[in-house]
Amino acid sequence: MSSNDSLQRLAQIIESRKPANGGDPGTSYVARLLHRGPDAFLKKIGEEATETVMAAKDLDHGGPTPELRAKLVGEVADLWFHSLIALAHYGLQPADVIAELERREGTSGIEEKALRKVQNRDAAEKS
């Protein structure tokens, strides 16, 4: 089973927990976040992103101990999970993100950033 399969399976579970699909905010954490709306799950994404940064910094300063490595993996898992909730809310799938990563594969990050800058400037000029 691939990592993509695991993400897709988790996305299906999240989709099933949407209040519109019968998810109960009283018994499901995902349903509760979705019921509360974007501010709730976006706040969690911000918190998890910060905790990911802190765990990485701890790993930088504490050395690659198994505990610190596990902490970073756990925080990234939390970040991905809450990001999957956001994707579901906005009608997107993990496959959309994977397709974007594949599209970028082989493209220099510097080139990609420069291209986005030109595209943003062109869009602003058209507005």
Curated annotation (Swiss-Prot):
Family matches, as PANTHER family:
HISTIDINE BIOSYNTHESIS BIFUNCTIONAL PROTEIN, HISTIDINE BIOSYNTHESIS BIFUNCTIONAL PROTEIN HISIE
Q: InterPro entries attached here?
A: HisE, PRib-ATP_PPHydrolase-like
Instruction: From the UniProt record, give the pathway where this protein acts.
Output: Amino-acid biosynthesis; L-histidine biosynthesis; L-histidine from 5-phospho-alpha-D-ribose 1-diphosphate: step 2/9
Annotated TM spans: none
Q: What is this protein called?
A: Phosphoribosyl-ATP pyrophosphatase
Tell me where in or outside the cell this protein is found: Cytoplasm
User: E.C. number, please?
Assistant: 3.6.1.31
Q: Where would you say this protein principally sits, based on its record?
A: cytoplasm
